[in-house]
């Protein structure tokens, strides 16, 4: 794609890189030698499901306020994208939350609708009355939460869990039981409560890294251990306080978890949870065919823009997939390789997401291969040697100031005009060669 004529300077900010780049085609199939080990029979990297929590966890984001119309718009967009479950705020949170839950349940979406409640019978009764497809029950199990939050011991937690689970099951809908603050809970307590709820028939149990303290190794060990204790599915919820949410989610799937909680842009309490787009990037690198068959990835940018507008934030420049430079290549060495085969410096194919890649050539780091590509786009003809010469001019100006695409195009066109207007003299045409004695005489007279 040719860059626009009214492009800003190359260092101007956060606009789509289409203003400063060259689109190039994708050649060759993406391959990843570091994908999931096919011999690992416990891995669910190629058969995971998403519980999308923008309308529950995302409502806990500091600047979030979703009115009913916005919630419905987001729910429809998530459903169109292809998420398996949509999780909603507890109807016990407020009267409007209950009304919104009922409204979304009536939309007839393909995704199953869940609501997230405390492990309490009052909440359970209210939840099943809204028409949801499932209920996600949670209660804190760490010493911190047992002492400073709800004040209950593990016996009380187990009894409450059994009562709520049996009630929800009696209404014929799905039920998940999750511990809160799982990674700071006593392992014996944790496994005992999971074993108890598994025996009475929960659809899945949940592990929650509520404070974002877990690392991938801890996640792998806990999920593997839990896998040997329960027969139901395992769902995982990871906060991003220490930057491990995406890595932890992927590791959980490798260890045998079945479902991951995500939100658009990762919005949620504090700095949020595993982001939908970030996890899509990680998963498509592991199993492209599965992800492409399941999710409408070309809808991701619009989905993120919708939520970003709703919570009044900008999409981060380094956001996986949709960050404004996610598929922009600047260094000359990179550009040369990308022009030959995009897989040299890309593990993701932008076309899978309805996006394009760009070669950012308006800078002093550019290489002559990138400039030659731009020359071709301008329908001009320069030899390789001439492309190298004009690249040197561009680099020289780039050492003085920031460049934009108009600067580069102007240099290229002026250079092209100069070389095409200068008569080309054949070496075999003797009369056109300057007379050597006369030339020496002229220099002597100077």
From Swiss-Prot:
<feature type="binding site">
    <location>
        <position position="176"/>
    </location>
    <ligand>
        <name>2-oxoglutarate</name>
    </ligand>
</feature>
<keyword id="KW-0457">Lysine biosynthesis</keyword>
<comment type="pathway">
    <text>Amino-acid biosynthesis; L-lysine biosynthesis via AAA pathway; L-alpha-aminoadipate from 2-oxoglutarate: step 1/5.</text>
</comment>
<feature type="region of interest" description="Disordered">
    <location>
        <begin position="1"/>
        <end position="36"/>
    </location>
</feature>
<dbReference type="InterPro" id="IPR050073">
    <property type="entry name" value="2-IPM_HCS-like"/>
</dbReference>
<dbReference type="Pfam" id="PF22617">
    <property type="entry name" value="HCS_D2"/>
</dbReference>
<feature type="binding site">
    <location>
        <position position="239"/>
    </location>
    <ligand>
        <name>Mg(2+)</name>
    </ligand>
</feature>
<keyword id="KW-0460">Magnesium</keyword>
<dbReference type="InterPro" id="IPR054691">
    <property type="entry name" value="LeuA/HCS_post-cat"/>
</dbReference>
<feature type="binding site">
    <location>
        <position position="57"/>
    </location>
    <ligand>
        <name>Mg(2+)</name>
    </ligand>
</feature>
<feature type="binding site">
    <location>
        <position position="56"/>
    </location>
    <ligand>
        <name>2-oxoglutarate</name>
    </ligand>
</feature>
<dbReference type="Pfam" id="PF00682">
    <property type="entry name" value="HMGL-like"/>
</dbReference>
<keyword id="KW-0809">Transit peptide</keyword>
<keyword id="KW-0496">Mitochondrion</keyword>
<keyword id="KW-0479">Metal-binding</keyword>
<keyword id="KW-0464">Manganese</keyword>
<feature type="binding site">
    <location>
        <position position="237"/>
    </location>
    <ligand>
        <name>Mg(2+)</name>
    </ligand>
</feature>
<dbReference type="GO" id="GO:0004410">
    <property type="term" value="F:homocitrate synthase activity"/>
</dbReference>
<dbReference type="InterPro" id="IPR013785">
    <property type="entry name" value="Aldolase_TIM"/>
</dbReference>
<keyword id="KW-0028">Amino-acid biosynthesis</keyword>
<dbReference type="InterPro" id="IPR011872">
    <property type="entry name" value="Homocitrate_synth"/>
</dbReference>
<keyword id="KW-0808">Transferase</keyword>
<dbReference type="InterPro" id="IPR000891">
    <property type="entry name" value="PYR_CT"/>
</dbReference>
<feature type="compositionally biased region" description="Low complexity">
    <location>
        <begin position="1"/>
        <end position="14"/>
    </location>
</feature>
<feature type="binding site">
    <location>
        <position position="116"/>
    </location>
    <ligand>
        <name>2-oxoglutarate</name>
    </ligand>
</feature>
<dbReference type="GO" id="GO:0005739">
    <property type="term" value="C:mitochondrion"/>
</dbReference>
<dbReference type="InterPro" id="IPR048253">
    <property type="entry name" value="DRE_TIM_HCS_fun_bact"/>
</dbReference>
<comment type="function">
    <text>Catalyzes the aldol-type condensation of 2-oxoglutarate with acetyl-CoA to yield homocitrate. Carries out the first step of the alpha-aminoadipate (AAA) lysine biosynthesis pathway.</text>
</comment>
<protein>
    <recommendedName>
        <fullName>Homocitrate synthase, mitochondrial</fullName>
        <ecNumber>2.3.3.14</ecNumber>
    </recommendedName>
</protein>
<dbReference type="GO" id="GO:0019878">
    <property type="term" value="P:lysine biosynthetic process via aminoadipic acid"/>
</dbReference>
<feature type="active site" description="Proton acceptor">
    <location>
        <position position="334"/>
    </location>
</feature>
<feature type="binding site">
    <location>
        <position position="210"/>
    </location>
    <ligand>
        <name>2-oxoglutarate</name>
    </ligand>
</feature>
<dbReference type="InterPro" id="IPR002034">
    <property type="entry name" value="AIPM/Hcit_synth_CS"/>
</dbReference>
<feature type="compositionally biased region" description="Basic and acidic residues">
    <location>
        <begin position="437"/>
        <end position="446"/>
    </location>
</feature>
<comment type="similarity">
    <text>Belongs to the alpha-IPM synthase/homocitrate synthase family. Homocitrate synthase LYS20/LYS21 subfamily.</text>
</comment>
<feature type="region of interest" description="Disordered">
    <location>
        <begin position="422"/>
        <end position="446"/>
    </location>
</feature>
<feature type="domain" description="Pyruvate carboxyltransferase">
    <location>
        <begin position="48"/>
        <end position="307"/>
    </location>
</feature>
<dbReference type="GO" id="GO:0046872">
    <property type="term" value="F:metal ion binding"/>
</dbReference>
């Amino acid at each position: 794609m040719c860059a626009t004529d009214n492009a800003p300077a190359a260092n101007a900010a956060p606009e789509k890189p289409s203003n400063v780049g060259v689109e190039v085609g994708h050649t060759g199939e993406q391959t990843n030698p570091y994908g999931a080990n096919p011999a690992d029979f416990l891995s669910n990297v190629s058969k995971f499901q998403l519980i999308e929590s923008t309308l529950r966890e995302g409502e806990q984001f500091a600047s979030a306020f979703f009115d009913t119309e916005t919630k419905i718009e987001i729910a429809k967009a998530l459903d169109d994208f292809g998420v398996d479950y949509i999780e909603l705020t507890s109807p016990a949170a407020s009267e409007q939350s209950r009304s919104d839950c009922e409204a979304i349940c009536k939309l007839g979406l393909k995704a199953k609708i869940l609501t997230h409640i405390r492990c309490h019978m009052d909440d359970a009764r209210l939840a099943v009355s809204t028409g949801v497809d499932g209920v996600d029950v949670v209660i804190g199990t760490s010493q911190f939460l047992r002492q400073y939050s709800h004040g209950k011991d593990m016996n009380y937690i187990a009894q409450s869990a059994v009562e709520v689970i049996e009630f929800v099951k009696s209404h014929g809908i799905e039920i998940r039981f999750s511990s809160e603050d799982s990674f700071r809970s006593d392992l014996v307590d944790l496994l005992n409560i999971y074993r108890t709820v598994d025996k009475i028939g929960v659809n899945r149990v949940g592990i929650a890294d509520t404070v974002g303290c877990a690392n991938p190794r801890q996640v792998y060990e806990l999920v593997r251990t839990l896998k040997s204790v329960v027969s139901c599915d395992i769902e995982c919820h990871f906060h991003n306080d220490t930057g491990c949410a995406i890595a932890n989610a992927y590791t959980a799937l490798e260890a045998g978890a079945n479902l991951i909680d995500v939100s658009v842009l990762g919005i949620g309490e504090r700095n949020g949870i595993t982001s939908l787009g970030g996890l899509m990037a990680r998963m498509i690198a592991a199993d492209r065919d599965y992800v492409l068959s399941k999710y409408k990835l070309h809808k991701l940018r619009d989905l993120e823009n919708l939520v970003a507008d709703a919570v009044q934030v900008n999409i981060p420049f380094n956001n996986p997939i949709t960050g404004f430079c996610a598929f922009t290549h600047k260094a000359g060495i990179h550009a040369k390789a990308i022009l030959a085969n995009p897989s040299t410096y890309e593990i993701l194919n932008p076309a899978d997401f309805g996006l394009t890649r760009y070669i950012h050539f308006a800078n002093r780091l550019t290489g002559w291969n990138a400039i030659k590509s731009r020359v071709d786009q301008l329908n001009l003809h320069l030899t390789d040697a001439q492309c190298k010469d004009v690249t040197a001019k561009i680099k020289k100006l780039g050492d003085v100031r920031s460049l934009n695409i108009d600067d580069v195009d102007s240099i290229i066109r002026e250079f092209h005009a100069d070389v095409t207007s200068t008569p080309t003299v054949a070496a075999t045409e003797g009369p056109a060669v300057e007379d050597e004695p006369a030339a020496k005489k002229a220099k002597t007279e100077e």
